[in-house]
Every structure is written in C-alpha cells, then in structure tokens.
Amino acid sequence: MKQYRKGLVLVACVLSAILLGSLQRYLVNGIPSQQLAKRWSDDEAFAQVACYFEKDVALMSEQIAGIERSLITALEEAALPAETENGGRNWVDAYSSEGELAVTSNRTTAQVRAFGVGGDFFRFHPFTLLSGTYFDSTDENKDGVILDELVAWQLFGSSNVAGMEVEINGAIYPIRGVVRSDSGMFSEAVEEEAATVYVSYDILAEAYGGSYPIDSYELLIANPVDEFGMTALTNALSMDEKNYEMIEVSARFDFLHRLDVIKHFGVRSMNTKNIVYPYWENRAKGYEDVSALLLILELLFMCYPIAWALNQLRKLYKNRKELKQKLMEKLKNVWQKAYPLLKRTVKTYKLVNRKK
C-alpha cells in the first residue's frame, strides 16, 4: 500500500510539471509580438531583438538609415546576404514612438493614444484586422492611419470604416484599417485597451513640430551564432548602453532566461533608467514574471521524482556487486537453455547441406 501511494505521488508530480510546462507555452504563444522569429522561419536561426531608449537620448528618425546600413554590413561580414536568392530577407526592422493625437471624424473628435510607427511594424505586431489592411515600409505616401475598434466606434459608431477619412493636425488622411483592441492578462494594468491609433511616424512627428524621438526599435535578423543579432545592433547604435535597454525577445522565455528572472525577481522591477515602455513590452514583462513563477512550480513538482530517481540510482550503485552476480546468473541460465537449441539448429543445418 505504501509503495502504491508513492507511485501515485510520483505520477501526480510528473503530470503536474508537464501541465505547468504546457500552460507556460500556451501563455507565451498568446502574445504574437514576441513570436516573430518563430513565425519567420522554422529551419534557420533568427533573433528578435527589441531596444527601448531613454527619453532624453532617444533615437531620431534620421539615424535609422545609418543603423540599417550597419546591420547589412554585419550580415555581409558573416557571409549572409540581406536578401536571399528566393526573395526572402535576412532582416526586417520597425520603430515606434508613443504620443497623443486629436483625431476628428465627420461626427466628433477624440483625444487618443497614438503610436507613430515605421518600418515593418505590423510584422512584429500582427493585430487582428476587422477591416482594411496594414501599411508597411513600402508605403511611400507616409499617410497610413489605422484605428483600433475603440477609436472607430467613438468616431464613427462602427468598426467597418476602412477607406473613410479622419483629420489629424489639420490634414486629412484615409483610414487604412481597423484592428481589434487586444485584451488578456495584464491588459488593464498596462493600459492595453486604451483607445489607440497607429499612424505613420511622419504624421506623429508633424503633430509635434516636425521631429519626435523614437521610443523603441525592433529588429529581426539572422542569428548564425548566439547573440549575433544583439551584438550587431549594439554596434549599429553606437550609443552608451546606459541610455537604452536591449532585450533578445526570441530568448526571453527560454529555460535559462527564466532562471535569470527568478534570480533577479525583486531587483528586475526597479527601473533606474528614464525609459517609458510601450504597453506590449510591459505586458511581456508581466508574462515573464508569470513564466518564471510557473518554472518555480515545475521545479518544485519535479523535486520528488528527481529525488526518487537519485535514490534508485543510489540503491543500484550500493548493490552493484549483488546485481552483477544476479545478472551473470541469469545470462548463464539463458545460455544453458539456448545452447542445446542452437547446437541442434546448427546440426540440422549441416545435415540439410550434405543432402544437397
């Protein structure tokens, strides 16, 4: 009975650890902004890197082209082309800055949170489209405007408004699309569900006098060796590392990183830099904490199975001579039973060959 209970506890611990691991993977897969490297390629190694800047030393849009040239040079030095033979790309980037805009429709005006975005922002942040399309780095007009459903309902009383127009800072812009307002764990805490518009960076900059600092820069790049992407971006920025925080997004939920989060669990929340993170990064940090807590529970549940396995190994080692003797005896018995049969088989085979 005692052994039966031990077996049940052992199985329950292992199953609990497996379930917690599955829950962690389910939660992580629920934040698409952290999954571009996985979506981009199953066969080749890519690193997704995010960089967030202090307000007083933030990046300016004029610096983006220089950063991109440096990244292309880093790829070429590693014998990797910026574009592959089949038309694929070994890097994509995006940048954004947060502010506020007054957006006016033919019905009313709404003061909303605004992200001025550039590059392939919507590759990194594939919001669910309710109508219309995204805009990207190929948009030469730089007049892209995307509303979330909260803004669309405030301004028009509907989410099906792609193609209609809004006024921002005295200029008229077509609405490219409407996206669903994300909701989920930590949404309220990080103000994820605040009424938001995503506009071309130039529109936001124009509203703030023609120039506006960039809060975040995101990069997906081929990663032939560990930390290649991080190193390439660090060299491209040529800034004091005290003025920004760089995160390898594609590795933030790996086992070793989760252990590091546990190690610095209290300290990591103390932000000593003048950085205001966008809501998606605050949400990801919350998921990091949850993921680390799940790992702690996984390890606790695995303590008993590991202790049981070590105890079994200890017993085997302690009784190794006796076990060896028993094994030899069993092998001897098997041989004694098998030898006569083998001998008869060989004898029969020889007789058959003689008759031939």
Region spans (language model):
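Hydrophobic secretory-pathway targeting helix
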Residues: 1-38
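Membrane-interface junction motifs in transport/secretion proteins
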Residues: 26-65
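Short amphipathic beta-strand/extended segments in non-transmembrane regions
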Residues: 48, 52-55, 64-128, 248-249
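Solvent-exposed, non-transmembrane alpha-helical starts
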Residues: 57-67, 108-112, 141-143, 183-197, ...
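Beta-strand-rich non-transmembrane domains
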Residues: 108-111, 116, 133-146, 165-181
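Mid-to-C-terminal secondary-structure elements
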Residues: 120-129, 149-223, 243-268, 272-279
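A cross-kingdom feature of multi-pass membrane systems that activates on extracytoplasmic/periplasmic
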Residues: 233-294, 319-335, 339
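Juxtamembrane interface at the cytosolic side of transmembrane helices
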Residues: 301-350
